Regions:
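Outer-membrane beta-barrel strand-turn architecture
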Residues: 1-4, 79-83, 130-133, 175
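C-terminal outer-membrane beta-barrel translocator/porin domains of Gram-negative envelope proteins
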Residues: 1-80, 89-112, 153
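Transmembrane beta-strands of outer-membrane beta-barrel proteins
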Residues: 8-12, 87-91, 125, 136-138, ...
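Residue-level signature of outer-membrane beta-barrel architecture
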Residues: 16, 77-79, 129-131, 140-142, ...
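Transmembrane beta-barrel architecture of outer-membrane proteins
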Residues: 68-72, 120-124, 164-168
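C-terminal beta-signal and adjacent terminal beta-strands/loops
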Residues: 93-110, 133, 141-157, 173-175
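Strand-loop-strand
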Residues: 103-131
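Outer-membrane beta-barrel "beta-signal"
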Residues: 129-134, 161-175
Length: 175
């Protein structure tokens, strides 16, 4: 917390899932995904990664956009405006990768010598309605760096609002 009205939130998250026993791959529900309201907010849910894999964003494509390794970093500045309304400005970075090289996910395998080139960057603004016992978040994220193969990587240099933005509505309820 900076003062009564302003604060900075920082989050680093990561994980690795390794199949064991007679499994060659993690079950679908245990695999990581990236993009969405609690991830890299410049992408819609399950549309980022793995690695430099460039999915076609079709309805069935989300199955291929999951991985075994996840790394994400979020930095957010929050300020109280009035009543219960807060403004947030954020920067997100991260991606997912696979442990093995899969034919259906070209460019998705984690490689120590190049993974840093596949870390996506996003930025944006959000409005929060803080009702103490729950929070409503409305975030608009924009892609800054898109690691997908065949893309203009620095999206911030040639923004296309429809292609490079994502809107997220979230209800945060403490348990």
């Amino acid at each position: 917390m900076i003062d009564e009205r302003n604060s900075i939130a920082f989050h680093v998250g990561g994980g690795i899932g390794i199949p064991y026993g007679n499994s060659d791959i993690l079950p679908f529900e245990k695999r990581y995904y990236s993009g969405g309201a609690n991830s890299v907010r410049g992408w819609s849910v399950r549309t980022l990664g793995p690695g430099s894999y460039n999915g076609n964003n079709s309805v069935s494509e989300f199955i291929n956009q999951c991985g075994d390794i996840r790394l994400e970093i979020n930095l957010e500045y929050r300020t109280k405006l009035f009543w219960k309304v807060e403004l947030g400005a954020f920067i997100d970075a991260g991606n997912i990768w696979t442990i093995r090289d899969y034919e259906s996910q070209p460019g998705g395998q984690f490689r120590l010598d190049s993974f840093y080139k596949e870390i996506a960057l996003a930025y944006g603004l959000g409005i929060r309605l803080d009702f103490s016992y729950f929070l409503l978040r409305f975030d608009m994220g924009m892609k800054a760096y898109n690691p997908a193969a065949g893309q203009d990587h620095w999206a911030i240099a040639s923004q296309n609002f429809k292609r490079d933005s994502a809107f997220h509505f979230t209800v945060v309820y403490p348990f």
